[in-house]
Amino acid sequence: MSPSVEETTSVTESIMFAIVSFKHMGPFEGYSMSADRAASDLLIGMFGSVSLVNLLTIIGCLWVLRVTRPPVSVMIFTWNLVLSQFFSILATMLSKGIMLRGALNLSLCRLVLFVDDVGLYSTALFFLFLILDRLSAISYGRDLWHHETRENAGVALYAVAFAWVLSIVAAVPTAATGSLDYRWLGCQIPIQYAAVDLTIKMWFLLGAPMIAVLANVVELAYSDRRDHVWSYVGRVCTFYVTCLMLFVPYYCFRVLRGVLQPASAAGTGFGIMDYVELATRTLLTMRLGILPLFIIAFFSREPTKDLDDSFDYLVERCQQSCHGHFVRRLVQALKRAMYSVELAVCYFSTSVRDVAEAVKKSSSRCYADATSAAVVVTTTTSEKATLVEHAEGMASEMCPGTTIDVSAESSSVLCTDGENTVASDATVTAL
């Protein structure tokens, strides 16, 4: 299939711009441009890698939260959010020069930009539907799994299908206008279409969702259960303020640059406009690592409590069925990792006081575990010595980084951190 006149003209103009740019620049300027492009690629690659690890962590948290038996509608929205975030991460890595450096093709570039916008629009819609679903369920006191009906799950499926179709339709203008960016060696929306791109994205990402949520919140203000909803509404406000800070600077700057510095008047080297655009683009890329945290924050009314209870249940089951010192150490390491996720979710969804309480809870968990042993009675000296040795190992696992004192004469196990001392109920009694 032969390329169209528009594609041929666009590629020709881009190649001519690149030839003229390199012809008029000196050796130092060429080295500076290469360094700037390398810095841009490094930032995109770093954020992409961190975002993939973060997304895998969110998937692990969702797998742990299945213990709480969440509603089917919540699982439908959350797993589609994971899929849309994966599309966004993959497309962003491709469209910003990481993998297109050796194969700058206009058709592939437009396809990547199209997938990126589909992931972006669908993410905004899935978050909107999840928020509206949970706000309605909490306000009516039907936010538990046994309250859900077949109609709730059916509506969630229809909403997901509608979101994907609408996202594909809204991303068509991007597929039609995308072009190669020889300045940053990637893909971009041409500067002359920046105003249209700003209008579409601000309406889908912020305008329409905030109107729908505010209309629902105004109605909930007159509900009898409004006190149960306000903490969730606070998380919603945090989410949209975060989106405002991540999305608006880049798209507004593109419009401003199109007015102050049209594409025909752009210089051959990198100027202040290019560095400001790099900063706003980096801020936009941070959405790939920040937005997945809100999947857990919107999962339920008390997501950190549900995550903590679910993981405690799984750890208890594992400790009952798993044997060996290494397995117990691995379980404790996973437990500490989940506490880190809880603190991150608390930071984006609750107040500073709740974060402090979460830190206090995680630091004192070993003391609660140390007091859960049972009274053991021994009859011989050998059994008594074996029990003391086992108590030392158990206490060192439950209270890492503390001073352990196991005394057969005093028949007690102590965990001390300088301020608190906890004695377990596991005693040694010689008959």
UniProtKB/Swiss-Prot annotation:
Annotated keywords: Glycoprotein, Membrane, Transmembrane, Transmembrane helix
Subcellular location: Membrane
Entry's transmembrane regions: 42-62, 74-94, 111-131, 153-173, 202-222, 236-256, 279-299
Glycosylation site list: 105
InterPro entries reported for this sequence: GPCR_Rhodpsn_7TM
Chief localization: membrane
Cellular component GO terms, alphabetical: membrane
Keyword Glycosyltransferase listed: no
Membrane topology label: Multi-pass membrane protein
SUPFAM superfamilies on file: Family A G protein-coupled receptor-like
Name the UniProt record assigns to this protein: Uncharacterized protein UL78
Native source species: Human cytomegalovirus (strain AD169)
Gene of this entry: UL78
